[in-house]
């Protein structure tokens, strides 16, 4: 019986994990790396980890405790970075662990985890840098554009020409183009794009140096109709998972027994019940959960 329950719990945990990574893909607006290119060389691997930390630093992620930062990569990313970091001077104990379990350990202050559920993002048909803004001085989460020359999919990352990100404390330009994520599919010929975060050039929540100019070019991360794996690095405050204890049914109307267990904030309810009509003894497991991107600016996608 315990083996059956463990198998069912594993299936549920996998689905929670998959939904969490998909939530991260759709809500994270920072993205670096070259989609389709794995960091298989030493130079590319170092650039990947350094670039991730740079973007998190620019976004104001805490630096005092680097154990707050994690990186979740798919199997190909794990394998390529293991290959790319061969020959670097490292703590012998870390190298021993890598050799023993085939998993990269803690590269450049990032707590690493391999996950087969890392999401695959597919861009729409819009050509990378041919669409433009229609009208200067725009702000907010909906940007008016000239009729799109193709589709743009939800989760796609974009930039606007000459619109840089700012340090969240000093409001000084980081020198890096501000990135945004498209929050709803946009059809071919559409004249607006929904984005996150809201474009805010002034005030307490300023996140860009300026609004895009009229006819500013919109550049899409990746290529038209291209797909990439959305490996994700994040500070521990970027995302949250909530699980809620559920109602315990009375032992009647077929319910034989119930149990609910919580550990580290994870709650599972097990219900055992009998179907008298069909003479079948059943057992089900339930979880009630939800993911949220609390501070998505403290996350970055590394596309491969």
Report each predicted region and the residues it spans:
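Structured, hydrophobic secondary-structure cores that serve as assembly/anchoring elements
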Residues: 1, 53-83, 256-259, 272-281, ...
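Alpha-helical scaffold segments that mediate packing/assembly in large oligomeric complexes
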Residues: 3, 7-62, 76-80, 122-147, ...
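Pocket-edge structural micro-motifs
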Residues: 73-75, 197, 285-287
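Autoprocessing Asn-cyclization modules and mimics
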Residues: 79-198, 202, 301-302
């Amino acid at each position: 019986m315990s083996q059956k329950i463990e198998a069912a719990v594993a299936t549920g945990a996998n689905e929670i994990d998959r939904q969490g990574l998909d939530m991260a893909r759709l809500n994270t607006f920072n993205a670096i790396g070259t989609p389709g290119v794995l960091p298989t060389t030493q130079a590319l691997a170092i650039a990947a980890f350094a670039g991730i930390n740079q973007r998190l630093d620019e976004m104001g992620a805490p630096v005092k405790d680097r154990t707050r930062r994690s990186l979740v990569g798919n199997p190909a990313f794990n394998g390529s970075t293991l290959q790319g970091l061969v020959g670097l001077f490292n703590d012998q104990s870390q190298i021993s662990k890598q050799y023993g379990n085939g998993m990269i350990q803690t590269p450049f202050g990032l707590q690493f985890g391999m996950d087969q559920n890392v999401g695959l993002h597919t861009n729409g048909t819009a050509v990378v840098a041919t669409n433009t803004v229609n009208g200067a001085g725009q702000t907010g989460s909906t940007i008016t554009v000239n009729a799109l020359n193709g589709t743009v999919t939800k989760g796609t990352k974009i930039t606007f020409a000459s619109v840089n990100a700012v340090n969240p404390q000093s409001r000084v330009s980081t020198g890096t183009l501000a990135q945004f994520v498209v929050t709803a599919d946009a059809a071919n010929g559409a004249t607006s794009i929904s984005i996150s975060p809201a474009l805010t050039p002034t005030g307490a929540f300023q996140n860009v140096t300026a609004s895009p100019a009229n006819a500013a070019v919109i550049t899409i991360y990746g290529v038209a109709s291209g797909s990439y794996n959305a490996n994700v690095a994040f500070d521990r405050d970027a995302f949250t998972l909530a699980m809620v204890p559920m109602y315990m049914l009375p032992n009647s109307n077929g319910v034989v027994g119930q149990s609910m267990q919580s550990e580290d904030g994870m709650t599972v309810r097990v219900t055992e019940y009998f179907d008298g009509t069909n003479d079948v003894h059943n057992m089900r497991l339930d979880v009630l959960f939800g993911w949220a991107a609390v501070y998505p600016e403290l996350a970055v996608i590394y596309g491969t």
